[in-house]
């Protein structure tokens, strides 16, 4: 519960700062994307754990699981054949929402100049570089990466809705 209170951007800033202090600049530039993925993943995993645990406890207490236990089905079979397929929907929904949030977090950090190095392509870096030209009449340098970022995040959320419907059927 405590880790859920720390925002992913703040956790990524903390991990990136630690990585910059512990390793050389060249190595950090080479490993920046992996550090960023690790930091965002560390900050988002409690949501997966909480949803998975809650869904598992709900499914475990249903009658068909009790009936399977009574007739002698092994715990491994119950887990993989009954419980796991039924908890996939909420986990898949949280996963695709987490993907959209991770994309936005990476873009935010790159926009702030903390994420990946400027030589690595990133939507946040493109938006930041175009921000200098925004009021000089060259608005498209910022506009198109920003629109693409919005469309990308929105498509992840649309996929969430579609994937939840597919798992349900």
Task: Please give the residue ranges for each predicted region.
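Alpha-helical transmembrane segments of integral membrane proteins
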Residues: 1-161, 169
């Amino acid at each position: 519960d405590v880790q859920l209170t720390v925002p992913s951007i703040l956790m990524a800033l903390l991990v990136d700062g630690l990585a910059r202090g512990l390793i050389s600049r060249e190595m950090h530039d080479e490993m920046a994307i992996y550090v960023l993925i690790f930091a965002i993943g560390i900050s988002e995993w409690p949501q997966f754990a909480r949803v998975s645990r809650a869904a598992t406890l709900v499914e475990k207490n249903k009658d068909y699981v009790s009936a399977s236990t009574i007739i002698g089905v092994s715990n491994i079979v119950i887990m993989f054949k009954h419980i796991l397929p039924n908890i996939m929907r909420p986990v898949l929904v949280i996963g695709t929402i987490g993907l959209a949030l991770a994309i936005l977090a990476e873009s935010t950090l790159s926009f702030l100049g903390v994420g990946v190095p400027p030589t690595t392509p990133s939507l946040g870096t493109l938006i930041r570089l175009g921000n200098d030209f925004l009021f000089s009449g060259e608005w498209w340098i910022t506009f198109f990466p920003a629109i693409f970022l919005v469309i990308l995040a929105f498509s992840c959320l649309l996929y969430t809705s579609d994937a939840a419907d597919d798992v349900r059927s």
